[in-house]
Design a protein with these regions (language model features):
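Catalytic cores of alpha/beta
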Residues: 72-81, 227-240, 292, 296, ...
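Active-site glycine- and acidic-residue-rich loops that bind
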Residues: 150-163, 190, 196, 220-241
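C-terminal helical cap(s) of enzyme catalytic domains, especially alpha/beta-barrels
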Residues: 96-112, 257-272, 329-353
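Glycine/Thr-rich beta-alpha phosphate-binding loop at enzyme active sites
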Residues: 36-45, 183-196, 238-296
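Glycine-rich phosphate-binding active-site loops on the catalytic face of alpha/beta enzymes
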Residues: 85-97, 180-182, 246-256, 305-306, ...
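A gly/proline- and charged-residue-enriched helix-loop-helix capping module
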Residues: 90-140
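Short beta-strand/loop segments at the ligand-binding rim of alpha/beta enzyme cores
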Residues: 56-64, 139-145, 210-227, 292-302
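An N-cap/entry alpha-helix motif that binds or orients negatively charged groups
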Residues: 2-52, 116, 121, 125-126
Length: 370
């Protein structure tokens, strides 16, 4: 039904307008008690065998919504209603900003992919923090907060900008993510270099500890798939050295070659980060490399090209404790998370692993032993 609706309606709409239309419907459904109860019962069944502990948090399962869909924390209950086990909001910047000029979001339907150059459009850390503080949750879910650099802030002042967001948002976050990997903010990816990343992450960690004294807010970093292998290793080593809680692999790619893309040049020529199915192989490769480097010392989150339960299962076997999706949600619709959960439960039941935690990294460990 959804795929027919997508072809007849959403496909004919501007992608950003379609996003906001769907967003409004989700938020509306979550506000109506009878409707949200019915939708959650249908789309968010719980599988006790998928219960997950990660980052010191207990979750219904390993599958969450990646950052970028709910930038301003306005639909957390709506996305939980659709079955996502954790919701990562953002990216949120220190100051409010409109993002890049439209048109800035493109569907590559033939490739089941998206290209975006949104540019961190969001209401800013103060407004998002106020909304989170005022939130009266309907569904118990884990909320991550993804923070990035305000566009007008010079690279040299990036740490102070991230600290501003941390001070505003840390108290309302179950975990924090430092995003240094979006291709749509000039100079941002330069912060992935360890000489820049070390002081930035140290400053954010100190700010989080200063701001929230009653608990330790888990801190993760999100990296790009375009990093060279030696740079992936360097970030992994730095994360362990600094005592980070996790790494999210990966963000969107600026690459177009070698991905087997079928879309025409009018789409492939658009600048921005590409997400979705074509990202699958490289994201899995980066994740496997990270797990081989860090093992179980920190939590790994797999994202990029997660279309179905098999994709999610392969990320878990590669080393991901948590898995996230976004682009495939656009193509699969409201049954996306339910299908992932059902498929994961089936795969675990027929696997040699007694628990989901036992499956994490099993394939990468097996390859290392050969």
């Amino acid at each position: 039904m959804y795929k027919l609706f997508f072809r007849l309606v959403f496909k004919r709409m501007d992608p950003e307008q379609a996003h906001y239309a769907a967003f409004r419907w989700i938020r509306l459904a979550a506000r109506i008690p009878v409707l949200r109860t019915f939708v959650a019962a249908a789309l968010a069944p719980r599988y006790k065998e998928l219960r997950t502990e990660a980052l010191g948090l207990r979750m219904h399962g390993p599958f969450g919504l990646a950052a970028g869909f709910d930038k301003n924390a306005v639909a957390i209950d709506g996305m939980a209603m659709l079955g996502f086990d954790h919701i990562e909001i953002g990216t949120v910047t220190g100051e409010p900003q409109p993002g890049n000029p439209k048109k800035r979001l493109f569907r590559l339907v033939a490739d089941r992919a998206l290209i975006n150059r949104m540019g961190f459009n969001n209401e800013g850390s103060a407004a998002v923090a106020a909304r989170l503080a005022a939130r009266n949750p309907v569904f118990r879910t884990t909320v991550g907060v993804n923070i990035g650099k305000t566009k007008v802030v010079p690279e040299a002042e990036a740490a102070a900008d991230y600290v501003k967001s941390t001070e505003a948002l840390a108290a309302h976050a179950d975990y924090l993510v430092v995003n240094v990997s979006s291709p749509n903010t000039p100079g941002l990816r330069n912060l992935q270099a360890t000489e820049s990343l070390r002081p930035l992450l140290t400053a954010v960690r100190e700010a989080a500890d200063r701001t929230v004294t009653a608990r330790r807010v888990p801190l993760l970093v999100k990296i790009a798939p375009d990093l060279a292998d030696e740079d992936v290793d360097a970030v992994a080593d730095l994360a362990v050295e600094l005592g980070l809680d996790g790494i999210i692999a990966t963000n969107t790619t600026i690459a177009r070659e070698g991905l087997g893309l079928k879309s025409g040049p009018e789409l492939l020529g658009e600048t921005g980060g590409l997400s979705g199915a074509p990202l699958k192989a490289r994201s899995l490769e980066v994740l496997s490399r990270l797990y081989a480097r860090v093992g179980d010392r920190i939590t790994l989150v797999g994202v990029g090209g997660i279309e179905n339960a098999e994709d999610a299962w392969q990320r878990i076997l590669a080393g991901a404790t948590l898995v996230q999706g976004y682009s495939a949600f656009i193509y699969e619709g409201p049954f996306y998370a339910r299908a992932i959960h059902k498929g994961l439960a089936a795969r675990l039941a027929t696997s040699p692993y007694a628990t989901l935690a036992e499956a994490v990294g099993a394939e990468t460990r097996k390859k290392a032993a050969l």
